[in-house]
Amino acid sequence: MSAWGYAALLAIPLAAAALRCVRPWFALNAIVSLSCAAIVLAVRGAVSPLFFGLIVSVAADWFMAHKAGRTGWYLCGIGGFFAAHALFLWDVLLDASLAPLPFLAFALLAAGYGLYLARRILPRVSDARMRLAIVLYMLISAASLGFSLAAPGAARTLGLLCIVLSDTLIAESDFAGNRAAGAWILPTYFLCHILLALSAVVERGM
């Protein structure tokens, strides 16, 4: 199949994402991520860290969607997404040039986002385990996004930027009391996975 044929398959996660935004069915979340993972697998012809990161995201998303105020489940969700980001970072590092730029980008992102968390989010989080999980997750997110700047493909960087934005919206909604932010969590999350799948298609050559 040509790269354009694989790109056409992105209609599957796009349709599932659009339907999920109007119907509260978790199965649609899984369809978005799993179909993106299938596209990555088909395009690359072998399993890869990106493929496994998308698969792990399904389990992490399940815990987040069903946490219902349970801190333990919330922590499982964060832990799952931490693992997914570690896999995304691994995938980035396979292509990235370890020049000074990504290290500088990581440092700036970690410092800026750390300041945001310290001032707006962490003071509102009473559970010490949750605070630690949030900080560690911020660091892996900053690393995957920062190092993506040294790897080819704007779609991958934009995808990782979308997941950071989605996570920020979750923090705003769950900890800062900004309920309006919740409306954009799923669209940005789904866009992340679709862009990551697109990045694999672009690698093939469009």
Name each region found by the language model.
Residues 1-206:
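Polytopic alpha-helical membrane-helix bundles and their juxtamembrane interface segments
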